[in-house]
């Protein structure tokens, strides 16, 4: 956030691959800098002894240089006293000068020009070029410089990065294994990280003789970034800005208590935590993590900068009431590059982790620090600018929980709620998945919902799809389809459920709960899905569950929502908050899309049945009569949706075949001809399309039973294309039917206004009720979506995403649901051991000098060594990210009973849909006393289908209108 001098901001940096930036912090004139020595490292090359990286080919282009840019190579960028500064330095930490050898060991060229000067011609290589490529890529970490930033007039960050004489390398770790490098760095402190023989040891007393909690000095860069107004402000503690606290938790989350010797800084400082923001992480890259982390800090800035708040401006600084907790699910799955981002922020350091304490395995590594530094998704460093304090990010209290083993998201939430939540006792806990980008004031809007409604137990904001610059992602039909799905859910589904008081799912990617509302039974039922509790819970745990309940925990968020609303003697309700917006990316490929929806569809279907079967628990809650009445309406609404979903496979097949028959083979008495290929060709084409439809539907069952989506991704792409083309053909035929219905017979002749009964019969029923049926279908299926989207003030998805959704609509059933139901048995649980943890050092307990108290000997590093290591951390953190390697699928070990249940479910599903198809399309059912004519049953079925869909759409629209009206009123009277 610090402005650069004019010349430095505009002129390019000239640098050679043998020169790199050093990150210096000058609290004095640095007069003793000449006495410094480089820090040796047994796992990294000695940069002083290395030859310059060879040139790859002919002469290198050198950026044009003038006196201004040359001066930058000899001078440091100085901030105010105590603030961070960037220097161009040589390997011993001092500014280098021009001359022979200034750029490696290159001599002046034939014209007497020095290396680095304009027009300098580098000599041709005299050694094997191919053999030198590896050396250059290994040294690419030296080519990187921290990307600095400055504020533009509108407050955005601008990249100010140097140019490279050798060209900008693709990645810091292009050929060097990131995981291996990270594991090596964990051992450095144990073998003398200083490398100068000057490292000291200190004895750290264990809390209650068993809890290892150590304070580590942070790099000067990090602690000097804290503004004096915060460092010396009310309620601030010096150690939270100068020391990072590390705790090795060797216990279960339920045992992380004050009684057992564990504590957290906010409580140690007697601070009230109003807002606990949890970011759950699995294996996302550093760009996704930086996106969530940076915009979370921007949201905290929105809260701190409030001027007229009746709450946040009382009882201490606002930033002291907010805690950000990052929970990482296991060491092995972590992209090790994210540790560099966290280390740059100050909440992590290499060489600190302990795999066990006196032989007792560490379950979670917990770091605590309060920082004012951030890294943007574009790898720009953001730090305070003393000249523009109103634009600076406020201090943020961080808790970083790194679980040693991968134990799933539910276990991460158990650390959040049962461990940290019980100590901090927050009023509201906000859950965000790594990769989700909170919009401006999104977290504030979520909190205001709880502040203004004392009975609000949970809430969620609007999640919309990242569309890229200029909406370029919409060119991918799968992204456009998901964008429409997200949007229409935000416009119609969530407002309706919010009106009833029970939102069926608060997405874990962006939701919030009142902490005291979910305490007790809601969390107890929710944590039954944590496999680390399976032995403790016995039959109630995940190992004792049948496959149906295990599938429920694929949609664990829905369990928490139902348990919260049905909580005994309580009247908590759930709500959707329109003003709170978050942005997330969605699967772009067919295989990823199918894999994601398998979990969603199976989990939501199982949980929908569970909520319907246990609806009676609502009578034991504290809801009033009015709320219970609307919950009953929602019960009927959800029941109809489940039934329609169950028979949707038959519904799509019947719709496709019958419309093709009506258009291609019209009745002779109607006077119409086969369309669009004539009386002879249209029936033949329609029969071929029907066979292709059936063949690809059967193919989906074969693929779902025997292949993973990644192993048959091209076949799935072809399936999406085929079903999409058939659906497009069907839409054309439907448009022709609508045109024929309104042009063949005038509308006034089809609808009678002679009397109310005549109007009702002609519009809704009888043989002449076609026009009314079509009008209802057009209004409810298309019209209400457009009207609601315009009233919502967000109609654009109806234009750029709705067409793709109409074309690919059938694939949601024919591909996604078929795959999901055929993989109902696919539920994998259990912990995965951590290979990365084996590289971590142990903490061995010894007695103190008096032979009484238990202590741990810890190497104490000099501040200069910490700062030197931090320079490399910043380079790695701000380096462009290389492409991630594809994850290897885990081996599955599924019981035969799960597959048997899956087989029975699929057979029952197919049987029900086949019976419906047969009943509608077969002529002779005389033995059952049913009319012989299928042409009588078919219109009846479609009338029922369209009228039912219309009623459900009208209910959604009424709920939407109520939500919009209530939201508008609440905006006028809400407290802030």
From Swiss-Prot:
**Which GO BP terms apply?**
cell wall organization; chitin biosynthetic process
Q: Which GO terms of the molecular function aspect are on file?
A: chitin synthase activity
Expression triggers: Exhibits higher expression levels in hyphae than in germinating conidia. Expression is increased in the absence of chitin synthase CHS2.
The protein's location, in the record's own words, is: Cell membrane
**Signal peptide coordinates:** none
Q: What is the documented disruption phenotype for this protein?
A: Does not affect mycelial growth, virulence, nor sensitivity to various stresses.
Q: Which reaction does it catalyse?
A: [(1->4)-N-acetyl-beta-D-glucosaminyl](n) + UDP-N-acetyl-alpha-D-glucosamine = [(1->4)-N-acetyl-beta-D-glucosaminyl](n+1) + UDP + H(+)
Compositionally biased residues, Polar residues? 31-40
InterPro entries this protein is in?
Chitin_synth, Chitin_synth_fun, Chitin_synth_N, Nucleotide-diphossugar_trans
Region described as Disordered: 29-72
Q: Which residues are glycosylated?
A: 32, 66, 95, 602
Broadest EC class assigned to this enzyme: transferase
The residue ranges crossing the membrane are: 639-659, 684-704, 717-737, 773-793, 801-821, 903-923, 944-964
Cellular component, GO, one term? cell septum
Highest taxon above the source species: Eukaryota
Q: Which Pfam families match?
A: Chitin_synth_1 (PF01644), Chitin_synth_1N (PF08407)
* Keywords of this entry: Cell membrane, Cell wall biogenesis/degradation, Glycoprotein, Glycosyltransferase, Membrane, Transferase, Transmembrane, Transmembrane helix, Virulence
Membrane-related topology note: Multi-pass membrane protein
Q: What does this protein do?
A: Polymerizes chitin, a structural polymer of the cell wall and septum, by transferring the sugar moiety of UDP-GlcNAc to the non-reducing end of the growing chitin polymer. Shows additive effects in septum formation with CHS1, CHS2, CHS4, CHS5, CHS6 and CHS7. Involved in virulence and mediates mycotoxin deoxinivalenol (DON) biosynthesis via the regulation of the expression of TRI4, TRI5 and TRI6.
By sequence similarity, the record places it as follows: Belongs to the chitin synthase family. Class III subfamily.
What is the name of this protein?
Chitin synthase 3A
In its UniProt entry, the species of origin is given as Gibberella zeae (strain ATCC MYA-4620 / CBS 123657 / FGSC 9075 / NRRL 31084 / PH-1) (Wheat head blight fungus)
Designated gene of the protein: CHS3A
């Amino acid at each position: 956030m610090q402005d650069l001098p004019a010349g430095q901001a505009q002129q390019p940096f000239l640098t050679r691959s043998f020169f790199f930036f050093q990150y210096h912090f000058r609290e004095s004139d640095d007069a003793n800098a000449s006495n410094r020595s480089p820090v040796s490292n047994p796992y990294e090359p000695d940069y002083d002894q290395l030859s310059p990286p060879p040139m790859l080919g002919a002469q290198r282009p050198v950026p044009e240089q003038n006196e201004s840019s040359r001066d930058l190579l000899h001078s440091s960028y100085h901030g105010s006293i105590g603030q961070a500064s960037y220097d161009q330095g040589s390997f011993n930490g001092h500014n280098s000068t021009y001359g022979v050898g200034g750029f490696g060991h290159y001599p002046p060229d034939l014209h007497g020009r020095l290396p680095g000067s304009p027009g300098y011609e580098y000599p041709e290589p005299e050694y094997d070029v191919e053999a030198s490529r590896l050396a250059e890529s290994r040294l690419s970490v030296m080519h990187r410089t921290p990307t600095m930033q400055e504020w533009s007039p509108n407050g955005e960050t601008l990249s100010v990065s140097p140019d490279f004489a050798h060209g900008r390398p693709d990645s810091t770790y292009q050929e060097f294994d990131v995981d291996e490098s990270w594991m090596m760095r964990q051992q450095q402190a144990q073998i003398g990280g200083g490398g100068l023989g000057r490292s000291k040891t200190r004895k750290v007393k264990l809390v209650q003789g068993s809890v290892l909690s150590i304070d580590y000095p942070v790099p000067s860069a990090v602690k000097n970034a804290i503004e004096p107004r915060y460092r010396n402000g009310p309620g601030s503690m010096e150690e939270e800005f100068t020391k990072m606290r590390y705790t090795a938790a060797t216990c279960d989350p339920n045992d992380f208590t004050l009684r057992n010797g564990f504590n957290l800084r906010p409580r140690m400082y007697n601070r009230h935590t109003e807002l606990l923001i949890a970011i759950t992480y699995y294996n996302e890259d550093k760009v996704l993590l930086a996106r969530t982390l940076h915009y979370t800090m921007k949201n905290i800035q929105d809260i701190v900068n409030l001027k007229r708040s009746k709450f946040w401006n009382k009882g201490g600084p606002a930033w002291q009431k907010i805690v950000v907790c990052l929970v990482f699910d296991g060491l092995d799955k972590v992209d090790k590059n994210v540790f560099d981002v966290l280390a740059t922020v100050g909440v992590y350091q290499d060489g600190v982790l302990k795999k066990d304490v006196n032989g007792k395995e560490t379950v979670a590594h917990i770091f605590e620090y309060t920082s004012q530094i951030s890294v943007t998704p574009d790898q720009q460093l953001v730090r305070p600018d003393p000249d523009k304090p109103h634009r600076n990010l406020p201090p943020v209290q961080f808790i970083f929980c790194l679980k040693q083993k991968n134990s799933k998201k539910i276990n991460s939430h158990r650390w959040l709620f049962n461990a940290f939540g019980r100590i901090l006792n927050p009023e509201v806990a906000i859950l965000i998945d790594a990769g989700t980008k909170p919009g401006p004031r999104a977290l504030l809007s979520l909190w205001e919902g709880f502040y203004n409604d004392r009975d609000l137990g949970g809430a969620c904001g609007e999640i919309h799809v990242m569309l890229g610059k200029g909406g370029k992602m919409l060119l991918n039909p799968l992204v456009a389809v998901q964008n429409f799905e997200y949007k229409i859910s935000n416009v119609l589904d969530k407002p309706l459920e919010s009106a009833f008081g029970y939102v069926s799912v608060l997405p874990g990617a962006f939701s919030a709960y009142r902490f005291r509302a979910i305490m007790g039974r809601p969390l107890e039922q929710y944590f039954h899905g944590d496999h680390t509790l399976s032995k403790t819970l016995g039959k109630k745990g995940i190992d004792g569950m049948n496959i149906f309940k295990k599938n429920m925990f694929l949609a664990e968020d829905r369990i928490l929502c139902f348990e919260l609303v049905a909580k005994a003697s309580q009247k908590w309700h759930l709500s959707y908050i329109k003003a709170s917006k978050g942005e997330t990316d969605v699967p772009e490929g067919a295989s990823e899309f199918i894999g994601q929806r398998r979990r969603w569809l199976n989990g939501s279907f199982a949980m929908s049945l569970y909520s319907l079967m246990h609806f009676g628990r609502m009578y034991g809650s504290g809801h009033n009569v009015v709320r219970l009445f609307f919950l009953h309406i929602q019960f009927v609404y959800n029941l109809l949706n489940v039934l329609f979903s169950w028979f949707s496979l038959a519904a799509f097949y019947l719709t496709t075949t019958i419309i093709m028959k009506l258009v291609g083979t019209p009745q002779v008495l109607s006077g119409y001809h086969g369309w669009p290929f004539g009386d002879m060709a249209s029936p033949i084409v329609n029969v071929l399309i029907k066979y292709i439809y059936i063949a690809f539907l059967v193919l989906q069952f074969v693929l779902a039973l025997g292949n993973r989506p990644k192993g048959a991704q091209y076949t799935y792409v072809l399936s999406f294309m085929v079903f999409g083309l058939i659906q497009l053909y069907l839409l054309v035929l439907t448009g022709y039917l609508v045109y024929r219905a309104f042009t063949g017979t005038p509308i006034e002749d089809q609808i009678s206004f002679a009397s109310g009964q005549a109007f009702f019969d002609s519009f809704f029923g009888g043989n002449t009720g076609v026009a009314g049926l079509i009008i209802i279908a057009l209004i409810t299926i298309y019209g209400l979506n457009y009207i609601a989207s315009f009233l919502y003030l967000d109609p654009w998805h109806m234009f750029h995403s709705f067409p793709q959704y109409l074309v690919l609509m059938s694939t949601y059933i024919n591909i996604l649901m078929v795959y999901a139901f055929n993989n109902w048995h696919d539920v994998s649980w259990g912990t995965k051991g951590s290979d990365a943890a084996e590289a971590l050092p142990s903490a061995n307990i010894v007695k103190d000098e008096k032979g009484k108290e238990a202590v741990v000997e810890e190497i104490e590093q000099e501040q200069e060594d910490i700062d030197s290591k931090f320079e490399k951390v910043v380079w790695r953190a701000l380096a462009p990210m290389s492409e991630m390697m594809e994850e290897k699928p885990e081996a599955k070990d599924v019981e035969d009973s799960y597959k048997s249940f899956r087989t029975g479910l699929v057979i029952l599903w197919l049987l029900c849909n086949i019976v419906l198809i047969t009943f509608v399309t077969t002529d002779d059912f005389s033995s059952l006393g049913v009319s012989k004519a299928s042409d009588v049953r078919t219109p009846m079925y479609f009338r029922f289908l369209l009228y039912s869909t219309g009623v459900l759409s009208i209910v959604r629209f009424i709920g939407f209108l109520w939500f919009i009206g209530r939201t508008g009123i609440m905006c006028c009277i809400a407290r802030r």
